[in-house]
């Protein structure tokens, strides 16, 4: 009975690690995709893989936040209705808050600098 429980536990750990590895691979692929698209200012194609990385693995890279600002600013400019504008703007403000959560202690861009950038965008 003990060996059956041990076997079940080992199988559960094995499958859990495979799922985690697959998610990591998916995050890496999407991170690479959105980064390359954003570098050439193809924000339309960058948006979907960026959203996947932003929601599924938000601490994977600081580029999620630095390039995310550019992607969302593009999305704001593309808005054709007030609702689209408001949704994209709210998402941009949340992006700044999330950057503070995951990278607020970064010496290159500390929390006060992120808040200053957020305030500047908010007052535009």
Per-region residue spans from a language model:
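Helix-turn-helix repeat elements of alpha-solenoid scaffolds
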Residues: 38-51, 84-97
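Basic side chains
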Residues: 2-5, 99, 118
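Phenylalanine-focused residue identity feature
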Residues: 14-15, 34, 74, 85, ...
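Structured catalytic/translocation cores of nucleotide/phosphate-coupled proteins
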Residues: 21-25, 34, 38, 46-48, ...
